Amino acid sequence: MVSTATQIAGFNFDNCLMNAAGVYCMSKEELLEIETSAAGSFVTKTGTLEAREGNPEPRYAPTPLGSINSMGLPNMGYDYYLDVVLDLEKEENSKNHFISVVGLSPEDTHTILKTLHSSAYQGLVELNLSCPNVPGKPQIAYDFETTEQLLTEIFSYYTKPLGVKLPPYFDIVHFDQAAAIFNKFPLAFVNSVNSIGNGLVIDDETVIIKPKNGFGGIGGDYIKPTALANVHAFYQRLNPSIQIIGTGGVKSGRDAFEHILCGASMVQIGTALQEEGPEIFTRITEELKQIMVEKGYQRLDDFRGKLHYLD
């Protein structure tokens, strides 16, 4: 029997597919749609210390090869999502989940994580080091010194399972430098990649989103080769204890298969989920299973990370 089950940091998931933070996860109602779908888990909207309205609309637009967005981290506040997940996990058949958070300052980050650490929540937390769409706030994970300092401070008190969501890296040296930092810490996972920041899409003579004069994060088909490269580069470099979540350009079973082949333990879906809705998890799961049957694979471990190279 072919299985797409997986695990991260000892947490079991019946399916390796889930949403990406930012898509179908703003409200309790949306999270419940993912919970009752074929997805193996959900991750909440990235929660900040206080609720945020985000950037002015229009701030998201589909494009022929994906999407562009400059959402600006709209969310209900991290405490809202903590309450939703704690209530949900009281249910007998609850799945395991991820809570996504970000601080708009180091102080905010520590306040959020210290609250999560002292809470009843025992599950996985995804710390976003990679949002490209908050005006005046750089992507932390591109500053290696700041990243190392922040993680050093966090792991001085945080002992629950924690992973980080990363921006795309494009230089081999940066893969080496980033991995060397991450390997110093007891991270449960890294999530590669967030959208490619500061793309520009034009319709006739006008940009198609309002914030930042049209600049926004690019997702969908555009970013799959970059996402696969990041997944595989970190799979080659990170300690085996640090697992990888692959995100970027997944709209078919073949796309999910390629992420796992590059080393991903779970696969998140963003743009395609936004366009197709939660039923996408059923379709992509069946497509992935069909590929596994055709290739004679029973479990994800049969091919995870086993990308072939040319002689």
From Swiss-Prot:
Its EC number is 1.3.98.1. FMN binds at K45, T46, N128, K165, V193, G220, G248, G249, G270, T271. The active site is at C131. Its main location: cytoplasm. It comes from the Bacteria. One of its GO terms (cellular component) is cytoplasm. Substrate binds at K45, N69, S70, M71, G72, L73, N128, N194, S195. It is found in: Cytoplasm. Gene3D superfamilies: Aldolase class I. GO terms for molecular function: dihydroorotate dehydrogenase (fumarate) activity. CDD domains: DHOD_1A_like. Binds 1 FMN per subunit. Its cofactor is FMN. Keywords: Cytoplasm, Flavoprotein, FMN, Oxidoreductase, Pyrimidine biosynthesis. Pathway: Pyrimidine metabolism; UMP biosynthesis via de novo pathway. GO terms for biological process: 'de novo' pyrimidine nucleobase biosynthetic process; 'de novo' UMP biosynthetic process. Pfam families: DHO_dh. HAMAP family: DHO_dh_type1 (MF_00224). Catalyzes the conversion of dihydroorotate to orotate with fumarate as the electron acceptor. Belongs to the dihydroorotate dehydrogenase family. Type 1 subfamily. This is Putative dihydroorotate dehydrogenase A (fumarate). It comes from Streptococcus uberis (strain ATCC BAA-854 / 0140J). The gene is pyrD.
